Amino acid sequence: MFTDIQGTWPTHERFILTSCDDKYFDQYFPRFYKTYKEHWHLPIHVHIIDPSDISMQRLDKLDVTYTHCTTDPAVLKWPYSYVTYCQAQRFMLLGHNLLEGQSVIVADVDSYALREPNEIQKQTLESDMAFTEYNGRLMATFCNFHHGQRVLAKEAAIKMQQLIEDTNTIGVDQLVLKQTFESFPYNNLTHNEWIRHLDVKTEEDVKQHNKCLIYHEKGTRGKNKPVETTWTDIGL
C-alpha cells in the first residue's frame, strides 16, 4: 500500500498533518489551511489520495509540504474499504515515517481552528501522545503523535493496513488507536475545550462548538454549517 507514496516526509519537529481524497481536499482544505495558518502558526503537511491535476497544481502553489498516492484497487475488497482506507491512511503514513524528535498534530481536513491555544494547552498537546476521549474511544479527529511512541505508532499503522485488507471493519483508525494506546500514558485533550464530538442539531450546539479550539461537525449527519472559505480566499 505504501510502495507508491510519492513526495517527501517533512523534517519539521512540529507540524500539522492532514490526509484526504481529492473530493474532500477541494471542498474543505481552503478553510483548513486558512484557519490553522492564522491561529496555529505551524507548518502543514498534506497527504492526498488520488489527487487530480488541479489539486496537485494547487499544492505546488501553497505554503505546505505534501505527499500523494494512487489507490491500489487490490486493497479495496470490501464495501467500506475506500472509506476506511482514506480515514486510516494518515495514521499509516505517520506510523511508518515519524522521526525522532517529531511531535505531529493529526487533524481531519474538515476540521478548522477557531482560536490559538495558550501555552499550557500547547504543552499538553505536544509533550506526549494526546487524544480526546469520547464514548470510550480515543478520537481520531484531532490528536497528537509523539516520537516517544514511535514503535507503537508503527504497530498501529501495520494493524490498520491488515484490517483494511482482511476485513470489512468500519472505523479502523479509531478501533486501532484505542487498542494500541489506551493502556499507555497519554495527555487528555478535554472534550468541549479542545473539540466537541456531539452532533450539531441546534443553535445551542453551534454555540457550544464555537467555544472550542477546534470546530468539527461529525460525519454526514452534521456538516450543516456552510464552507464559506474558497480557494480564492487563500490566494488561488
Question: Which stretches of residues belong to each language-model region?
Answer:
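Conserved hydrophobic/aromatic beta-strand scaffold that supports enzyme active sites
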Residues: 93, 129, 142-144, 176, ...
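A recurrent flexible, glycine/aromatic-enriched loop bordering the glycosyltransferase active site
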Residues: 131-144, 168-169
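GT-A fold catalytic core of metal-dependent nucleotide-sugar glycosyltransferases
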Residues: 86-137
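N-terminal anchoring/stem segment of glycosyltransferases
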Residues: 1-76, 99-100, 151, 208, ...
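Catalytic core and acceptor-binding pocket of nucleotide-sugar-dependent glycosyltransferases
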Residues: 147-236
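A short, glycine-/small-residue-rich helix N-cap motif at loop->alpha-helix starts
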Residues: 25, 78-88
